[in-house]
Curated annotation (Swiss-Prot):
SMART domains, sorted: rADc (SM00650)
Organism of derivation: Leifsonia xyli subsp. xyli (strain CTCB07)
UniProt GO MF annotations: 16S rRNA (adenine(1518)-N(6)/adenine(1519)-N(6))-dimethyltransferase activity; RNA binding
Listed name of the protein: Ribosomal RNA small subunit methyltransferase A
GO CC field: cytosol
Amino acid sequence: MNELRLLGPAEIRDLAELIGVAPTKRLGQNFVIDANTVRRIVRVAGVEAGEVVVEVGPGLGSLTLGLLEAGARVVAVEIDGRLAERLPLTVAQLAPEAAGRLTVVHSDALAVTELPERPGRLVANLPYNVSVPVLLHLLERVPSLRSGVVMVQAEVGQRIAAGPGSKVYGAPSVKAAWYGVWRTAGTVSRQIFWPVPNVDSILVGFERHATEPGDDELRKRTFALVDAAFQQRRKTLRQSLAPVYGDPAAAGAALEAAGVAPRRRGEQLTLADFVRLAAR
C-alpha cells in the first residue's frame, strides 16, 4: 500500500483546537503524536490489506490512518461525539482514497453488542481507565475477533499477560486467558503521547483460542470464582471462596472435589483449575 500522510504533533494539536477538544482524564484520552509508533503498532499487529479491523478510541485519527495505510477496513468505535464526527472528515482530507474503508460507530465500547462488519482483529490505543473492561467486553460480544494488539498502561498490560505464580497475576490475567493466549509485545515511550501521561505504556497481543473452555454459563461461574479468589489475595481459597459456597467448610469440600488444595491461594491457580472448580 502507498504511504499516507500520518498525523504529527502539530496536526494533532491543531485538530484538537479546531473542534474544541481538550484531552480529559475521565475518558482516558492521550493522543498518539508519533507516526513511527503508529506504523510499529500496525506492523506488530500483523494487519493485512482487505481485512476488517476494529479500533476502540480512535481519537483524532493517528492510528486509524496507519491502519488504513496498511489497507485494512476500519470500524472505529468512539465515545466522544466531536471526535466521532470529525474522524471521517480528517480521513477524507488526508487519505481520500481510503475514506470508503472507514466506518465510525459513535458509542461507548462497553455498550457495543454488535458491529457493522465482522472484524477479525482488534488494534487500539485503549483508554487507560477502562482498558481491561473494554477488552473483556469485546472478546465476549464480538466472537469474530481472532487476534489483536492493544496499547495499554504498562502495569495493566503486564497483569493481563501474567501467568500463575507471578506477583502481578490476578483476575484480569485469568479472565483474559479464557479467551486466548496473551503476550507483551514491547514498551512504548510516554513521550509519543499528547498530553504526556504519568505512566508508561506497553503493547499486548493476543491470539484467540480455537474453542473456549466452556459455554457462557460456565464462563460466568468461573469469573465469579476468580473475582472472589482475588478479592483478598492473601487469604487461602478455603477462606476467600467461603462467601460463594456459604462457609469455609463447604468451600474446602468443593476445592478438594475439584482436586485443588484448600490452603492454596488464587494466584497459584491456572484458568483450568478455576474452570474445573466452576464445572462441579
